Amino acid sequence: MNQSISSLIKLKFLQSHSNDKNGNKKGGSNVSTGIDKLRESESYRSPFLQLAEIQEHTNNDDDKLDVKECEPTKKHSKLSRIRRKMGRLDLNFRSANEKGSEDDEILVAQHLRNGQDPEEMPFKSENNIDSIEKVPKPDGERVTLTSSGSDNVKRNSKHAPFIPVKPALEKFPSSNRLSRDYRKSQEPTLFNGDRLVPTLPTVSRISTSSSVGSSTAASRYFNPSKRAVVASSSSSSSSIKFNSLHAIPLDATPQIELAKQQDEISKRRFGRRRSRTVDVFDYINKNNTAKNKPPLSPSSFIRTIDEKNTNSLMQDPMGSRGPLLPDDANIISNDTDGAEASHPDHQVLSRSRSQSTSFVQGKGGKRKSIEDEGYHNKLGLPHGSGPTSVYNNKSNANSTITGMSRRSSSIVNALSSFVNLRSSSLSSSRQQHLQQQQQLQQKLDVSLEDLPPVPAPEFSDSCKDFLIKLAPYGKFIGIILTEKDDEFKKNCLNYLLTNCFEFKNDPLDIALRKLLMFLELPKETQQIDRLIMAFSFAYYKAQKSYSKKKGIECPWSNADQVYFIAFSLLMLHTDYFNPNNKSKMTKHDFVDLVHNDKYSGGNEIPMAVLTYFYENVTAKESPKFNYFLMSPMALDDSILDKDAFDTNFAITLSSNSMYSPIDMIKRGSIIPKEASLSPIFYPLTNSISASGIAPSTAASCPPSTSGTINGANLGTANSNSNRPASNSISSYFSYNPSSSSSGNATLVQDDINVYSHIINDTLNEVNLFPEVSKYWNKNALKANLLRNEEHKYEKYYSIMNDTKGGYLRFHKSQLNKLNLPNFEILNDNSRSGCKNSDYKYCKILQMGAIMNLGMPSRKFSIVNSAKIHWKKEFAILTSLGLLICDKMDWINPQMMKDPKSGTTNYIIDFKSGFSFVPGSTIDVYNGLFADRERDSLGKSHFASLVLAYTEHHSTGSHTSNTTAASSSAKHNEGVFEPSSDEEDSITNSTDGTSSVSNGESDNDSVSSSDNQLSSNDSNEDYHSIKDEYPIFEDENADCLLYLHTCHRNFIWKCANKYERDNWIDSINLFSAYDGCYVEIGSIANTICNKRKLTILQRMERLRSIKSAKWEKLKKFESTLMLMGKCVPISTKTKTDMINRIRQLAVRMDWLIYEIKRSELFVSIIKEVTRKQAEKNILEHGKGEEEGQGNNDDSDGIDDIEESFLFNENSLQVCVSDSSYDEYSNE
């Protein structure tokens, strides 16, 4: 294929040559035949044939130039020849010496004056004819063809069609390898030591952030050491012309132009390719001042530059290499036959961010590594700062300015100037500071291979004995014990994690950080798996023991579940902080991935806890801690770094204690007290400030003053400035200056330093247990709501069963104003024509005036802001539910006799238009439950009512909450807001019966108002239990009643304790039998709540509700304890966790409400049934049926009189026949 193309190009060349010859004949041009033959020679045509081949691919029209442009005119034939001569490519080399070139120029000028053609001058005998190496020898020697003659080679215009019309301009500065010094040193014998003319401008090889795929075209395709081509040029001219439109630089060559054309074709084919963003640390001009520095560490402790280069041979196929760092594998020398020449002398530059390899330009044009020049001990920039290239800048200072001025209009020039500016700014003290820190880290960076051989366990060794032998190895014990799948080492690892680590109070993410803080993470996957498995077993064992001690359910199912979550967190950390990973795992992806795993138990972990895990793991990268400060190697202060510890390692072998992080933390020092051989050590708390310590960037000095910790006297400070503070928490961190993988790698001011709290054993000060205690009353389950003293359940049960009593009468037109639940009519006798067919009756169980706690209004003055607003209201408990009205001026009871039952009853007419009627509807409250203590069923139920007064009492201001009587307050009173899934499980049943009888409902009679979070109270701070509600200190607690309803909650203040107990007993008795088929004595057309269950079914349903809610509560309690252990690093995470704790506490409060309510109702039904059974036995023994009826009637009258606020003197006895006839059935 290549030969065919080459033949076609030669044919085109001959045709064009023939056309030029014919054109010259027409113009009357007389050119000698010998000169034409010379112009057709192969040594001259080869470069242009290659250019023609490239140009044919790019533009087929480029090789069809107008021949007329090259036709010489008779008038200016000599100048035309000179112009055509200058339009040909210059190969950058002068004649034998500079003086000879100047003589040639003078000679050419004299010939022009005399009218003689300078091309007819005799050729010189020197070997200066152009030559090109075509095929390299197999043995690596270079073959160069030179012919004698003058450097003013005769050229013909017949070759003009092969001159490229649109040469590719160079976008990057040329390589220093093409400089004068470079080529002179490359082939010193070829030019016999003669001085060369300046060629390509030498520019400093400072890379830019350009996204062009390759470096310089010249450095990629041209190898001056492989060929030598000689031509003439003028030293005073900056450029020569191909034609009148295009200018080619003076130092251009056909090979360079060929490389440019190929590079341009590549760019057109592939387009612009993005390279990675250039970091400031990637390109820094460093002076070669480190040649004479002594090595900082032995060569056996650090990898050589050659090893780093070997590891960096993995290259990005998409060209992620820096723009100005060429890939020498792509530096190819192309000739007309397509031959390629490799360059083994050039090393590949690494773009790894973790390894810094520096290069210098050595003699002979070869780029040698620093190791060859005595730089193998030189430390590069810190990890993550990118590779640093060092070049010989002695001959580049002036050439850089020249090269940049020629490309002043290029965007590359601007970017190069910007990088130069930034690079120069980094030569400040901060850069030196980072280098010093890196040098210190290199000295303190120890691997397991640097330590003496690990002793093998003996047959008689126990786990403790072997761990004592491994104590000097410090944090590498985990790697040693997980190296092989050995049963004895596995038991030793379990023993170490169980007895030397304390995980019972730590969340899983903090426990994992603590593990990796004291034990090095192995590099092998199997070793990591063994370590995480042993950690999961120890963590689950500690958590289960702690939960059993607290009497709660363990939040973890088994050790496999802990292993799954721990390994997920480890993978998340690796994924998030990997600088090469551009697509980080999002919070939603992590939570969804773990929570959907049913096989490993990930679905049992609450999503709120998984969200906390993600935010905490990604908040801070886990650092690598220093071996010398986290192991017994810190015993001897003479051990400064790894250069000296080999001779002192035997000191620690006599230690009789294990490597125990518990002892290190409790003693406040990493040095075990019984193994301390030196009195000079420093506590961990010396360098810890109250605001938290961020990783130190410099070697901190030991404390200057002595002190005590835990009663132990401390020695004087170490005066050695080469060693950091022995136990300074700042020196524990491995400094990473880049941390570009995460935007929140640096701690915010409000965030906590979790490692400081681990070292000082103060994690309990930053966990969320204090927040849990604000919202959760752990003693709520122990409360006994059934009073042991005398109660009046039997009394109100008799009132409900007896016909005689009080009734509230409604006209049928007024029933639509009552917000009534499902009801039924007892003794229905509403036939048309009857006088009482238009009225309905509700039986009254209890009524009276109460003081209701209202919400504070804006009308209050600042002086009265601390006073509680008690509003006087009137309450009526009926067979339908509870009615509350503002005033009682409409109450006018009348005594009427029922002709069917023969009883005299009190009738109160419900009259519309009075003050208690709000307008449209009247709420009838159901699902009632009364209590004498505010927090016996949880802290969230009445918080909305009390917090408003607590805020006013503490600040003297007033909120804009509506009053308690407002119907809209029921939607805005709650302080807590459940989540969306919680609202589905909490239903607002209209009565106690429907909550337990309706199979479709969740059987939760809860208030909708207490399930919503008011935006104004979302950030309220709760006080301690003692000072939580100081406004009730002046109130009599025996007169306060706390009422739960399905609509809202109330706080009542009764006149005395007796009245309060009556209200509590009547409300709870009514709710216990609500919806049951119990005998209700009533007159005709009495309405009550619809009855669905028998008493036995009602009790069975209440027991099942209690059991189901109890199981759910135990799970919520374990989840709440899991949230309480959380240690959020960021402030945002802490705020979110507090809100989730508060929402969970609300759900738990309502579970307690259902449990205790069901328990109390079952107890009431049992108690009343027992009393009724005893009464029936006594009545059956007496056998006095008539006396029983009279006694019952009299008892009923007494009960009714006791239950009303008014007595018979205030009643109007209606004995007229008209009233009697109206009340009668017929």
Curated annotation (Swiss-Prot):
Gene Ontology MF term list: guanyl-nucleotide exchange factor activity
Stretches with biased composition (Low complexity): 956-969, 994-1017
Gene3D superfamilies reported in the protein's UniProt record: Arf Nucleotide-binding Site Opener,domain 2 (1.10.1000.11)
Limits of the PH domain: 844-1074
Family annotation (CDD domains): Sec7
Biased composition (Basic and acidic residues): 131-142
Primary residence: cytoplasm
Entry's free-text remark on domains: The SEC7 domain is sufficient for nucleotide exchange activity.
Other comment: Present with 279 molecules/cell in log phase SD medium.
Activity regulation as described: Inhibited by brefeldin A.
Function: Guanine nucleotide exchange factor for Arf GTPases, stimulating the nucleotide exchange from the GDP-bound to the GTP-bound form. Catalyzes both the GDP release by and the GTP binding to ARF2. Has no exchange activity on Rab GTPases. Involved in vesicular transport.
Domain SEC7: 405-620
Polar residues: bias regions: 349-360, 386-405
GO cellular component: Golgi membrane; mitochondrion
Gene Ontology terms describing biological process: exocytosis; positive regulation of ARF protein signal transduction; protein localization to Golgi apparatus; response to endoplasmic reticulum stress; vesicle-mediated transport
Gene name per UniProt: SYT1
Residue numbers bearing the Phosphothreonine modification: 277
Protein name listed in UniProt: Arf guanine nucleotide exchange factor SYT1
Species this chain originates from: Saccharomyces cerevisiae (strain ATCC 204508 / S288c) (Baker's yeast)
Family matches, as Pfam families: Sec7
Location of Phosphoserine modifications: 369
Region (Disordered): 17-39, 113-158, 311-405, 954-1022, 1178-1198
Keyword Phosphoprotein included in the entry's annotation: yes
